[in-house]
Amino acid sequence: VGSEMCIRDRDMLSYIKKYPISLFIILTVIYLSFFKPPKTDLDEIPNLDKLVHVCMYLGMSGMLWLEFLRAHRRDNAPIWHAWVGAFLCPVLFSGCVELLQEYCTTYRGGDWLDFAANTTGAVLASLVAYYVVRPRMKINKQ
């Protein structure tokens, strides 16, 4: 049991070393998703929050892609791992956040359009990472 714990600790440390900026962005998105924002004049701009959602998830997914591609330039990690970790996980994470906002807070509500905006951000980041960044980093794994 002791050696298993040591291996798990090492694996966790490995993720922190490979994805430090992504982890910071994820924590920031969690904070922004659950804090009670003050009322401002910006609330009057229609759908500004949707643009913020696109940007948050574009940033999260994009950084996950960049850090994956950088960390796995020289090994045989299949590219589908990036699709799961940098696209699917942020989309599922987004859905969980929307459900938690709806059912576990009194000052936030889940919103299908927020989920769609979050997914749009992850899609945009993934397309740019796969078709623009990955070829430039010479990552050609299927």
Describe each region flagged by the PLM.
Residues 11-115, 119-142:
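Bulky hydrophobic segments
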Residues 1-7:
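Short, small-residue-biased leader/transition segments that mark boundaries at the very start
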